[in-house]
Every structure is written in C-alpha cells, then in structure tokens.
Amino acid sequence: MSTKREDHLRKGADVTPTEALVAGSIAGAISRAFTAPLDTIKIRLQLQPKGFKHRKSVVTIVKNLLENEGIIALWKGNVPAEILYILYGGVQFGSYSIISKSVSKLENNYRINLSSANHSLIVGIGSGIVSTLVTYPFDLLRTRLIANKNRGLLSMTGTIKDIIKLEGIRGIYAGIRPAMLSVSSTTGLMFWSYELARELSNNYQRVPFIEAICGFIAGATSKGITFPLDTLRKRCQMCSVVHGRPYTASHIFVTILKNEGVFGLYKGFGISVLKTAPTSAISLFMYEYSLSFIRKIRVIE
C-alpha cells in the first residue's frame, strides 16, 4: 500500500475536465443525500425575523417542524437541492480543473511560484463564481421551498411560475451578488484549507478517511469565516417574498445590524457548521475516491 494517497486537487494534478465533472457530480449527489435535514434546519434558523419574544432554538424548530409539517418537511426543497448539488459539484470540480491549468500557465508565463494552498485559493474562488452563475436559480428555488411552512409541499414548477409572475425573470437571480461573494469566498477558503490540511497530514496518509478528515476541517474553517455572507444571501433571496419589493444587499445588511445586532448575522451558525463540515468531508472524500475509481475502470478496460 502506498504511503501517500494522491491529492487530485493539488497544484499540478493532471485531471481532465470530464473526469472532474463526473466525479464532482457523484460527490455532490452523495453529500446532499446525507445532509438535507440539516440544511432545512439551518435555513429556517437564518430566516427567523426580529419580533419573536423568544428566539427559537434548533430543538424548538425541529419539534415545531415535525409537529406542524411532518417528517417529510426535513426534505423540503430536496429535489431542486439534489439537482443543485449534482450540477454544482460537477461544475465546481470541472471548472476547478480548467481554471487550475490556466492559473498554472500564468504562473509559468510570469515566473510566479504560488504555494499549493494559495494556488487552490485563487482557483477555488474562480470555480465558486462559475458554479454560482450556473446553479443559482436552483439555490433560490430551494430556499423558497424550504421557507414554505405549510404542511403541503409546493411544486417546483408552481414556485418558478410564481417567482416569474410576481418578480419577473430577474426574480430567479434575486440576491445573486451577495451569493457570488459568499460562495466564491467560501469555496476558495475551503480549497485553501483543504490543501493546507493535506500538506500537514503528509505523515498520516495511512489514517483511514484522511481526505474526509481534511475536508471536515476545510468546511468548518471556510464557513466560520464567511457565514455572515451566507445569511445575507438567504435574506436577499427571501426579501421580495416577505416585503413585496426588492432591497439591496447593503440595505438588508444595515437592517440586520440595526434590528438584530451582529448576532443576527450568525443565526443558524452552529447548525450550519454541523452541516457544512460533514458536507465538505463527504464531498471532497467522494471526489477523490470517485476519481480514483474512474481511473481504475479505465485501466481495466
């Protein structure tokens, strides 16, 4: 057995866009299947408005959700979310492969030698921007479906029609700017943290699931730094539904600070880390494993 498992995300890794797209889609689908309920709870926490006598805890939200909407409500918005994760995973890792090669060429042309971690930070930011542009409508749709507190489940097509009817085509991209900032920052920091963790774990490559452990650390680190941007993104996605007219991201940011304080930017932080860290762990592990498996099949053929 090799003492060092291959890191397919490291600077200089020879991964084709097609390989990365397929492995990334598999990783996205599997990670979503395990973390859907945590995502629902996290978004409900983030969307709590000011005005409750008592802020609802995670336990209270879960209890109310099960009593009033049934256990299936934990998977509200899961169909668009599964599509989102499959698309996002494929586009994220596929674009990562393409951008990584482009950045490496620029480094060679301008005689720059970035560390593997800093290389991954830049590439990750780029892949986050591309992935957000492609998959954002599904992210918004997921948020709208999860925010629905009626026992009956809204349909995807019905929700899309309502958004277009009430808000126009632009409504499908409500909150895209803070989303771009949030996702690109989180993605860049995740890949940066992952590469740092992989470098520090060089002497522990025989540890089972070392990729998942490094992915868990990366997910927790990136989310801890960028969580306020994620809250702002969710509020922007819901503002036109709640208030009937669009607000700018800066207006919503100031309103949160004024009415809820800094704490308002961190609503749902605990459950978010509990969801994001395992998601990153599963996603990065499955990407590495799926890519190795795809290559083994090709060798056998």
Swiss-Prot record:
The chain crosses the membrane at residues 20-38, 79-99, 121-141, 172-192, 207-227, 252-272. It is a multi-pass membrane protein. Solcar repeats lie at residues 15-102, 115-200, 206-293. One of its GO terms (molecular function) is thiamine pyrophosphate transmembrane transporter activity. InterPro entries: Mit_carrier, Mitochondrial_sb/sol_carrier, Mt_carrier_dom_sf. Its main location: mitochondrion. The keyword Glycoprotein does not apply. The keyword Membrane applies. One of its GO terms (biological process) is mitochondrial thiamine pyrophosphate transmembrane transport. One of its GO terms (cellular component) is mitochondrial inner membrane. Mitochondrial transporter that mediates uptake of thiamine pyrophosphate (ThPP) into mitochondria. This is Mitochondrial thiamine pyrophosphate carrier 1.
